[in-house]
């Protein structure tokens, strides 16, 4: 291949190499900026100015040029022949000016006279991170989520006075500057911060124990499982939204009643259960069966049971039910399906509720207590039957002789022994 072709090819690809201005580049630039002479003096004002082509881009952002010597509307001494009305907004390119010098010819934003408000451009390298925070908008989808120490969701501003975070004492608020707090370590290291976790404890798998949370509203009937969350004594149910957000973030969790061992998926469900079942006040009683309730709405829902017809019949034994769910549970008896075994004796049950009632025999727990005589029972149905002794209510009556009974089993026995019916 001819050597001349190689030389031409090398010159054709010379744009890969960085260009450096020639020796007469600055001289030509000064001539363009100051046509009156090469020494930088202007023929109009006569003031001594520094050639603008030698200024760096950063200096143009932070330093405004001095235009006190020339009038804003004057185009005298410039390279353009346009009207002076648009002098401060646009300057046409010159054939003898390079692209680098063409940028320096354009006036800075401080020279734009028609704008009523002054514009101060920022040099981003000259500002600290704290000075730029007002330019960034924070995204806060949930106010309770940006306090998760183990998840790196802290927020710098303090919580509102009515926020659940204010329920924690000042000693925990001061501990938020530990390893899990912002500035005290990485986001992933919050779980190992110990006392530095201002609001939460260890969120790891090792914290899957039971943590009792005494409250004034529930009388110490709560227990939390799965996250090791701690709340101050007397905080009450105001931290329930906080616990719920944590449960959603960490992917699961359950809340167990320490009185009857019933498990709920949300703290609100546990609170309603404690208030209705273990608060000790059930002033609303059913006139048909004598069953008592803690709320009037629960009594109204229960009265619908007595008015409904038994439209769901079992095809095996002919027993009728008012709800399809009750019939489905009844069919487990005929299929002999017992999926719930007792952890103490191995006895199996059709329903989980029956298995829990059976475990009270082994543990000796009697969570249901009579408010009149103080007698305790392991099952709520036994407490309901016992309460009829104090009220004298007999909901089961014989249709042959009219005699009433407090229990259905007593009515069945009466029909068999006195009337010969089965």
UniProtKB/Swiss-Prot annotation:
Database matches in SMART domains: ZnF_C2H2 (SM00355)
Pfam families: zf-C2H2
Listed name of the protein: Zinc finger protein Gfi-1
Natural source organism: Canis lupus familiaris (Dog)
Residues with Phosphoserine modification: 20, 56
Region ranges (SNAG domain): 1-20
Residue ranges, annotated region (Disordered): 1-107
Biased composition annotated in UniProt, kind: Low complexity: 34-47
């Amino acid at each position: 291949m001819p050597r001349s072709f190689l030389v031409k090819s090398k010159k054709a690809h010379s744009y890969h190499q960085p260009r450096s201005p020639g020796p007469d580049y600055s001289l030509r630039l000064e001539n363009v900026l100051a046509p009156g002479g090469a020494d930088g003096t202007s023929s109009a004002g006569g003031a001594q100015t520094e050639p603008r082509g030698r200024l760096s881009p950063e200096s143009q952002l932070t330093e405004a040029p001095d235009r006190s010597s020339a009038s804003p509307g004057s185009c005298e001494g410039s390279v353009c022949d346009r009207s002076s009305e648009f002098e401060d907004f646009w300057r046409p390119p010159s054939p003898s000016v390079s692209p680098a010098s063409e940028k320096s010819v354009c006036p800075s934003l401080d020279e734009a006279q028609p704008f009523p408000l002054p514009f101060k451009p920022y040099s981003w390298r000259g500002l600290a991170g704290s000075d730029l925070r007002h330019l960034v908008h924070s995204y806060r989808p949930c106010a309770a989520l940006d306090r998760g120490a183990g998840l790196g969701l802290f927020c710098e501003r303090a919580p509102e006075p009515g926020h659940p975070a204010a329920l924690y004492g000042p000693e925990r608020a001061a501990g938020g500057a530990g390893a899990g707090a912002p500035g005290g370590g990485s986001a992933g290291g919050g779980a190992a911060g110990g006392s530095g976790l201002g609001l939460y404890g260890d969120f790891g798998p090792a914290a899957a124990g039971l943590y009792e949370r005494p409250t004034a509203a529930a009388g110490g009937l709560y227990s939390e499982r799965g996250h090791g969350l701690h709340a101050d004594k007397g905080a009450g149910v105001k931290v329930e939204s906080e616990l719920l957000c944590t449960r959603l973030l960490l992917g699961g969790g359950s809340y167990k009643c320490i009185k009857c061992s019933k498990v709920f998926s949300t703290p609100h469900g546990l609170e309603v259960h404690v208030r209705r079942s273990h608060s000790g006040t059930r002033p609303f009683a059913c006139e048909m069966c004598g069953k008592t309730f803690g709320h009037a709405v629960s009594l109204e829902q229960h009265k619908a049971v007595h008015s409904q017809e038994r439209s769901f019949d079992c095809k095996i034994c002919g027993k009728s039910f008012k709800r399809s769910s009750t019939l489905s549970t009844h069919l487990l008896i005929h299929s002999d399906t017992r999926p719930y075994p007792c952890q103490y004796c191995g006895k199996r049950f059709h329903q989980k509720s029956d298995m829990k009632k059976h475990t009270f025999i082994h543990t000796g727990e009697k969570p249901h207590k009579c408010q009149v005589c103080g007698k305790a029972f392991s099952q709520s149905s036994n407490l309901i039957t016992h309460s009829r002794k104090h009220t004298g209510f007999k909901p089961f009556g014989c249709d042959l002789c009219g005699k009433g009974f407090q229990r259905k089993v007593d009515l069945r026995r009466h029909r068999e022994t006195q009337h010969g019916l089965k």
